[in-house]
Swiss-Prot record:
The chain crosses the membrane at residues 31-51, 74-94, 109-129, 162-182. This is CASP-like protein 1D2. The keyword Repeat does not apply. It is a multi-pass membrane protein. It comes from Glycine max (Soybean). Belongs to the Casparian strip membrane proteins (CASP) family. Homodimer and heterodimers. PANTHER family: CASP-LIKE PROTEIN 1U1 (PTHR36488:SF8).
Length: 193
């Protein structure tokens, strides 16, 4: 009886001498996005740190009353989180530049980037949400709680700085989402089909 098997064995289990596909190289876009993340972090920190304004408030006597980011723990956390994000983006930009010359490191580095980018995204999102909540209270106040009055009609420059800083941080979080997507897609394109 003749065998119907091919001489090479089952093609599913045959080892191939061809290397796995290299995938499309998106490291140039990765470096650009990481630089944008650094720029967004830096701008957001500089804008909120320079958000100082002093106004004369009329209580029984006119008293100068300053508004600074240091007076709110939410804004301090915002500055700390975006400073960490800026440092992280510098380190990962340099790692991307170094790995672009070494193809063997790219896939492994992409996996680490996905994990760390997701962590940084959580930090940016929590800091932006916290600062946004306090900024909203400054803009609208809360008439149900004594002492939580609107302040943005008095401290207009301070509120504009805080709002601009939060908007730039939101842009940074979108950039981080794009970095995660780009790393995941790069890994997916390297998987043999």
């Amino acid at each position: 009886m003749a065998s119907t098997d091919k001489p090479g064995g089952d093609p599913e289990y045959r080892t191939s001498s061809t290397p796995a596909p290299a995938g499309v190289d998106y490291f140039k876009f990765d470096v650009i996005l990481r630089f944008l993340l650094f720029a967004a972090s830096l701008v957001a920190v500089v804008v909120i740190v320079t958000a100082n304004q002093t106004e004369v408030i009329r209580v029984p006597q006119p008293v100068p009353w300053p508004a600074k980011f240091r007076y709110s723990p939410a804004f301090v956390y915002f500055v700390a989180a975006l400073s960490v994000t800026g440092l992280y983006s510098i380190i990962t930009t340099l790692a991307s530049l170094l790995a672009s010359n070494k193809p063997a490191l790219k896939t492994k580095l992409l996996l680490y980037f996905i994990l760390w980018d997701a962590l940084i995204l959580g930090i940016i999102a929590s800091a932006t949400g916290t600062a946004g909540g306090v900024a909203y209270l400054g803009l609208k106040g809360n008439r149900h709680v004594v002492g939580w009055n609107k302040i943005c009609h008095v401290y207009d420059k301070f509120c504009r700085h805080v709002g601009a800083s939060i908007a730039v941080a939101l842009f940074g979080s979108v950039v981080t989402v794009l970095l995660i997507w780009l790393s995941a897609y790069s890994i997916h394109s390297r998987v043999p089909k």
